[in-house]
Each structure stands twice: as C-alpha cells, then as structure tokens.
Amino acid sequence: MPLPIPRLLIPALLLASGASLAENDLNWVDREQMATFPAVQQREIPDWCAGIYYNPHVGMPVEGSDTVITADHSTLTQDGLIKLDGDVLIEQPGRRITTDIAELDQATGKFELENGMRMESDQATFIAENMSGQTRRKEGSLQGVRYSLFDTSARGSANYIFLKQNTTTITHGTYTTCAPGSNGWVMQGDRIFLDRDKGWGEANNVVLKVKSVPIFWLPWMTFPIDDRRKSGLLFPTLSVGDSSGLDISQPIYLNLHPQLDATISPRYIDGRGSGLDSEMRYLSRWGEGSLSYGVLFNDRKFDNENRQVGRWTHNGDINRWSLETDFTYVSDDFYFKDLDTGLEISSQTHLPRLGEARYYGRTWQVLGRLQSWQTIDPTLDDADLPYRRLPQLQLTGDPTLVGPVKGLWLSDITAFGRSDSDDSGKATGLRGHMAPALTMRLQNSWGYVEPRARLYHTQYRLDSVDANEEDNPDLTTWGASLDSGLFFERAGNWFGSSFTQTLEPRLFLNKVAYEDQSELPNFDSGELTFSYNSLFRENRFIGYDRIGDEEKLAVGLTSRFLHDGTGREQLRLRVAQGFYFEDRKVVTERAVEDPTDDQTPVIGDARWNFAQDWYLYSEGQWDIEENKRERSNFQIGYNDRERRVVNVGYHDRPADSIRESEVSAILPVHRHWRLIGRWMYDLDNQRSLETMAGTEYRNCCWKLRLLSQRELMDDNGDGNLEADSTIWFQIQMIGLGGFGGQVDSLLERSIPGYRRQYD
C-alpha cells in the first residue's frame, strides 16, 4: 500500500548513489541484453568489452520529485516510528531502493534497512546486508556491500561503508574495472576515503593484486575520482634500446594551483646514468604555456659531461593581440639523437628561439618578432647558418579606397644579424621593404577577374661589407598581374548518389620588371617549392631580398564533386602549368629551376574521399620538354577515428635520388587484439629506414602494448647511418593508470592519423 514518508529520508537513503555500488546482479549488461532495450536507451559497448554496467530502468533524476513507497505491511506508532516489512520499495525518478524491513523514527531521524537492501540509480548500483543512518545529519552506513559504477564500468566490495554529506569512507574495500568473474587486477585498501567536493580520494594500506597475486603495496596513496587534478605519483615510463639500455623514469605530478601544475621525473638510463626531467604548465590572462628542463648527470657515453635541454612555449590572445614564444636550448648537438624526449623538434637541424606579437585589426595587422636559432648539425658551415631577426616589424593592410578598388599595403623593417663566433664574412644590417598595391576584384556567381598593380622597394643599411661594396644599396621595381577564373557546374548521379560537379578554369598573367639584384645581400630569400599554388603567386621567391622578374601565364583547372546530401567534397582534381615569355634573369645561388625554360612542369594532384573513412591522395610533376617525371607522391589512408588506422605511401624525387615507400597501420585482428606496424623502405638503396612492429591487448581491465622499433640514425654526425633498436612496453589498468606513456607519443609521431584519444 502507498504510504507518505518525510522527504528528508530520501537524501540519506540515496547518498550512496553518488558513491555508487554491484556483479551480474549489479546491472551488468552484455551485448545480447543491450540489443533488447529500446533504441533510445541503448548505450555503446566498447569493442574490447563483453558488456558494461548500466541500468536504463530507473530513469533520470528529477529534483523535487515525489517519493513513492510501497510495502506488504506498514505500521505507525504513537512515538512516530514507521515500520515497513515485506517487499519494501522506495522510488523516485532516477533512484530506487528495495529491502525486506525498513524503520524510520520521525522524531530523531534515525532509520534502518534490514535483511538485505539494494540501491539503484542512473549512476550506480549497490547491494548491502543492511543500512542504517540519520536523515537530519544526512549520514548512513552500510555493511557487507557490493557495488558497481556506471561511468567507469567498475565494481568492488566493502565490509563497511560510511556516508556523510559528500564524503564516503570505505573499510576493507576493493575496486576493479574487470568484467564479472575476472579479477585481472584488483586494488584493495584497508580504508578508502572519497571526497566528492574535492574530487579526490585517499587510501591506506593499499595492495594491488594481479590474478590474486599481490604485486605492490603502498602505505598511503591519493587518486582522482573525477577530472580534477591532484598531486601524486604517476605511473613510470619504460623502454630498452641498443645505445642506452634500460631507460626508466618516475613522474611526480604537482598540482600547484588551479592554473599551474608541474611534473618532475627522476630518470635512470642504464648505459648512461641518472637525470631529471621536469615540465611546468601555466594559464594566465596572457595565454597558456609550458616550461620544460631536463638534465642527465655525467653521461658515461659522453665523456661524463652533464647534458641539458630546456624549452619555453607560450600562446595567448588578448583582445586583438596574439602572443607566441618558442625557445629551445640543448647543451650539445647530439642530445636528441642520444636521448629521447618526446619532443617533435628532435628531428630539426635548427632549434627555434622565437618571440612575436601580432595585432589583428579589421583593416590593419601589425607584427613584431624576435627570432634566432640554435643549430645542432655539426656538418654545417657558418655560411649555411640562418640569419637572426633582431627585431622584425611589419605592417600589412587592405583598406578600401573607391568602390571595388582596394589598397594592399606591406611594409617590413628587419635587423639581420649573425652570431659573434660567425666567420663566414656575410653581410649584416638593416633592411626596409615596401610592396604597396592597388587591386580590384570583380566577382559574381559564374566567375571573377582581379587586376593588380604593385610597387616593390627595398632599402639596405649594411654593417659589415667589403670596401668595394656599397653599404646602402636599394632596389625599386614594379609588377602587374591579372587573375581570372570561371565557375561551371552540373548535376549528376554517380553510384546511386546525387552530386554537383564543378569545372573551374583559371588564368593568371603576371609581369614583374627586371632589376639587377646581384649586388644585394640575401638574408632570407629562396626559391619556393614548386606546387600548384606557387604558380599563382606574384613573386616566385620567398622573402624580400629577391623580386623575381618574369612574364608568365599560368593556366589551371580544378574540378570538384560535391555530395548534394552532405555538401562533402568527395573528389577534387587539379592540374596546372606555367608558360614564360622571357628568360628569368634574377636567380639565387642554389637555383633549382632552369631560368631559360619556356614552360614549367605540369603539376597535378587529386584527393578522393571514396568512402566514409577512406581517402586517396596523389600528386605528380612532369617535365614535358624532357618527357620525364620530376616528382610523384601517392598515399592512401583509412581512419575510422576509433581503433583502425591504415596508411600506404610512395614518394619519388628522381633528382634527389629519393624513392621511398611507407606502410603503417593499427589493425584489430580480434576483439581484444590489435597489430601495430610501420615500415619505411629506401627503394634505391634497398634498405629499411625504419621498422616498427608490435601488438596491443585490451579488455575491460587491461591495455598492454609491446613495440619493437629499429631505425637508421646518424649518431656521430658524420653522415653514416647506423641501426638503433628500442623495445617499448606499456601497461595500463583501465580506470586506474599505467606506465609507458611515451608509447602514445611515439605512435602519434609515427603513424599519421593516430590520436591517443581514439583509444
């Protein structure tokens, strides 16, 4: 019979639903059961799990909702004691409690649930032998408890649980994410305290068991129960390599402030010695950034010298301003070759030291930059080292003048310098450059035309020049261009789907007058890598020291296939070629293209998204006059943004004697197993540049990876490549943590399309 009950009872009875508690009778749902639920109630079960903990029958919580209580028998004494027995059911939307016997003293607020009880919510389920508590103090205690947590699909047990406000104290409790009937790993603690206000828990006398065998013991530990951060030990990283042997580090996380944290990692490398890596991350009103520093003391394979690396990166936006810094330092040229850091810069020849600020206005943009480099390639001569920009100031804008006529403004002033130890004899000094233009773009639905006229002026004030050289040279020239294009489209139906096909021819006529620039210094100019887009540029050089004379007509054709239902570009085809009316007179010292050619190679590319997760990209460059291939690239890839990644590539540059193939993949071969591999092969020299092979096993409670990597490296800087092999191991206890986190960084760098969040 329905019986009203004071609403105050409910918060205490349901306190534990925030702490959550279950096994097969704790709402474990396998795939067959999930399929029987209505579609709106079904939840995804990960491929590697047989099921999840989930209960769709209790609904979602509703604040202030009525409570319905039923029981076979009920009595109310004159003292205000309510007694219920026989199939007692207490229900609210999102919550449900069942028990055999329930008592509530309305005068004191004490209550008891006896002869077994079960509490269910939309977040958890728990079963206990009995429960007692106090509604006014919002506290309760349970004995003989089993529980399940839906968010993490975890389960456990406890001899005793005490609930008060938003805290939970568990005595002699266990925790695991393994499926029912499996105890791959179990964390066991004498006392576990959970504070949901702070988002963290503490455990005393903690034992981690694997297959019921104790693996390690900790007298005390803290751990997160939500996404908030907390200081403590992270799991170690581990690898074994040919050159250094065993490499192990133990990260220690420090949550210093809501906007400041740090990680300190003592490190031991068997063949080299001990060291320390550290990183600090911060957030401020100026943006976000990180500071990192690493040191290896008395490296036994490097004349017992200390070896160091440091880096500062920062990115931020303030109103219309953006700020960026990237400063890197290493103590020696071979640091990145000998010691893996996980940094993407480890393969660079010149390490950046950059600080810049940009202002983005509606019409005008301002750039201020300081830039230098640390070169870590000992084979480079001083003459090959890049210039420093100390500083660079730039102003650009596109003000509207009259009607469709707009002005384009570019002005740049840069002070170029070199290191104090440089003995190349190259000039240094100040360069000012201006390139104002007038342009008028006329456009409608079927095409456009855009004439443009530009003036170029460059002025130098040089510091170190020979006596017979001018210290204030300058350059003035002009250019004009006409860019035009048409848009055609037609409807079509291919493979049962409706598409819109476009045809977009483009003509670009460009004229830049010749001025002798052989006596001018060259601080930062060079030839552009030839590509489809480079054919439609006004200046064929990058930088401002060289203005490339030319009279050229570039012809391009683009065709796209757009899916009418989704608007997705299913296929894009492009082809272009340039034709010269005059030989080019302005060249750089390292010119690649012949300035007397009367036409460029034909270049084309294609990207075909031929299925939801598949794409194919191909690019080719063909010299018509010589009837030979100059460059070709091919890549086909698959990425379902979950567990499968496949890449197959081929790269061919005959002029540079480069012909390489690449295959990489992460493929499931079973519900629990994935194969991981990468192979880069030098077809000309018939040698493997890099091989990586490994496997991953994953179920509800484990993720294990074992990888073997072999790559050719120039360890001595003499140009001779030698093989270096490393074995990587990663283990993660799902919902608890693991070690070997550098494996994720390795896969992100090595396998295009892999992202650790997909796992």
Swiss-Prot record:
One Pfam family per UniProt: LptD
Keyword set, alphabetical order: Cell outer membrane, Membrane, Signal
Signal sequence residues: 1-22
Cell location: Cell outer membrane
A GO BP annotation: Gram-negative-bacterium-type cell outer membrane assembly
Keyword Membrane applies: yes
InterPro entries, per the entry: LipoPS_assembly_LptD, LptD, LptD_C
Top-level taxon of the source organism: Bacteria
GO CC entries: cell outer membrane; transporter complex
TM annotation in the entry: none
Subunit-structure text: Component of the lipopolysaccharide transport and assembly complex. Interacts with LptE and LptA.
Primary role: Together with LptE, is involved in the assembly of lipopolysaccharide (LPS) at the surface of the outer membrane.
Family: Belongs to the LptD family.
Listed name of the protein: LPS-assembly protein LptD
The organism of origin for this protein: Alcanivorax borkumensis (strain ATCC 700651 / DSM 11573 / NCIMB 13689 / SK2)
